[in-house]
Amino acid sequence: VLDACPFPSELRVSQVVTCLRPAFSQWDDSLFGGLIARFGINSNTKMKELSRGMGMKLQIAVALSHGADLLLLDEATAGLDPLARDEILDMLQEFVGDGERGVLLSSHITSDLERVADRVVGIDVGRIIFDAPRETITDTAGIAHCAASQVAEILECVPGARVVKREFSCDVLVPNRFEFAQAFPEVACDRANVGDYLHFMLKGGR
């Protein structure tokens, strides 16, 4: 599933299906028809008449209708209104609900990853900068807020910590905020999110 609908602009939805059906031995017309009805897509609509959200939903309907076990999505929710994003994310969760299928989602919208991802991989200029279960980031990691004078002690005591210096203070990403709270009870430490984690892994230092 690409970030732009790849089908020729003059083709109608029904013609796209006619072209794709012979290519997939497990193509399911009934499933496809149900999906486009759910999405409000008319089979006579031309590709050029579809909004970006509708084009994305059409691609996903196609992907779900030929027995795929793994969906590959490139920025599937970028540029969509909140309702369309929610609908696509709900559908992806339904797809993996049986535990037998998977989704590989490329996205810059970190809140979407928090909602649907089991594992998050951060990539910068082709280099993997972290690879972690989502709950390790959102349920365990934390952002500590401290004075510059406290940073050296924290970095010495907390393996894997990364610091970002502010104008009058410092923020430190810590791998386990519960252990950190026991070691430094006087330092405020908040729950991290995927966006925080990515920022600190890119910009933070030791």
Label every model-predicted segment.
Residues 2-59:
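ABC-family P-loop ATPase nucleotide-binding domains
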Residues 12, 133, 190-193:
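Short loop/turn segments at beta->alpha junctions
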Residues 67:
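Conserved catalytic motifs of ABC-family nucleotide-binding domains
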Residues 82-84:
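Helix N-cap at the start of a conserved alpha-helix in ABC-type nucleotide-binding domains
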Residues 89-174:
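ABC transporter nucleotide-binding domain
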Residues 162, 166-206:
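C-terminal coupling/interaction segments
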